[in-house]
UniProtKB/Swiss-Prot annotation:
It comes from Lentzea aerocolonigenes. InterPro entries: Amino_oxidase, FAD/NAD-bd_sf, Flavin_monoamine_oxidase. FAD binds at residues 15-16, 35-36, 43, 61-64, 444, 451-456. Involved in the biosynthesis of the indolocarbazole antitumor agent rebeccamycin. It generates the imine form of 7-chloroindole 3-pyruvate (7Cl-IPA) from 7-chloro-L-tryptophan (7Cl-Trp), with concomitant two-electron reduction of O(2) to H(2)O(2). The enzyme is also active with L-tryptophan as substrate. Belongs to the flavin monoamine oxidase family. RebO subfamily. GO terms for molecular function: FAD binding; L-amino-acid oxidase activity; oxidoreductase activity, acting on the CH-NH2 group of donors, oxygen as acceptor. Homodimer. Keywords: FAD, Flavoprotein, Oxidoreductase, Signal. This is Flavin-dependent L-tryptophan oxidase RebO. PANTHER family: AMINE OXIDASE, FLAVIN MONOAMINE OXIDASE. Its cofactor is FAD. The keyword Cell membrane does not apply.
Amino acid sequence: MSRGHKKITVLGAGVAGLVAAHELEELGHEVEVLEGSDRLGGRVHTHRFGEGGSVPFVELGAMRIPTKHRHTIDYIGKLGLTPKLKEFKTLFSDDGAYHTTSAGFVRVRDAAKVLVDEFRLLMSGRDLREETILFGAWLTAVGDAIAPADFRAALRTDFTADLLEVVDRIDLDPFLVGAARDQFDLHAFFAAHPEVRTSCTGKLNRFVDDILDETSPRLLRLEGGMDQLVDALVERIRGDIRTGHEVSAIDVREDHVAVTVHNGHGVNTLRSDHVLCTIPFSVLRNLRLTGLSTDKLEIIHDVKYWSATKVAFRCREPFWERDGINGGASFGGGRIRQTYYPPVEGDPTRGAVLLASYTMGDDADVLGGMPEAQRHEVVLDEVGRMHPELHEPGMVVEAVSRAWGEDRWSNGAGVTRWGKDVAACEEERDRAARPEGRLYFAGEHCSSTTAWIDGAVESALAAVRAIEAGDGR
């Protein structure tokens, strides 16, 4: 039961803003949503190659949901989308996919020998069991596939600490998998031995979460596109949702919040009783902000974002199936990093989509900083070395890409807290989410699960509770 009718302005129509708007309306409040861009959904961006329900599509933004992300799973259920949840096949899930090594591209099922040889060379001089070497080889392989450039060297440095010595004292036999027992089930291992996490030093400690999440066998997608989550929310919101309304200034006063908005017809300053800001801090820090505490301004400027760039090709056909790949992803290395093979949905005569390159961090900035045509050419050249079928006449019908680090509405793909311990992460979350008078905050940057949809939903629900309780300063 609401503690009284309130008029609330929500800034930003990403998942956090839309969830909050819907929840606030259900509590009886009057809500309007202002979005600077001409598109709803924020970093959920399903690109469709044409019009109609049967056209191929690709997720240029969020594309997967871990089953443990209960905020998202529960909300999908609330919106009636649970039947659409299907398995998301990721890196290392299809043993026919490729992995780049010093010996070139090898199938995942054949990669163990090369990976072990590479890791043994890295660990030369250390007396470790063969099973421990196998553990280290596969953890390094996953880290290489997922970690941005500035992180990969740190992974190897952390292996020189105590981690492998701890692992070397554990019975690893139950975690050897594959026909030749030359693959290692990292998920089962860390689940069975959580104490090993305390041996991870530096950046590796935080990154293990991402390693396990991004290669988890328990990842889901929305059949038909992730934008169905956005569409379902928009359909349920009764208040105005205005696109093309760009915020340039926020001024927090004792009894209201003044928001300066550019809407294409001029500049207006809106006076709102309560404002919920879901604008990423990477964008918010460039606005004119007054009336906020020194601590809030500091955290707005200090939160670190990482980039992500995706390049996709609509192909004449899913040629990778002829090559024995039935989904999942390959690690191509170089500038392309990860290549995904989404399921073919819709009319197969319209082709199939290859997510040719998914990069993060510094790797994403390299591709993201290129003109679009050059970016597509570079990716075609590098992925073509792994999949020469791409160079067949007429195989690539069209290309599309999104560089989130260059996107003026996000200035990054998500917040990173790698290298921070649990206490530091919680302190950052608390400072980011803390309201300033009648100005409240939500978004993945205000959550305990940054860079995921779950963080957006979690923070939106928390902000709604704070608005209801009147927790503003």
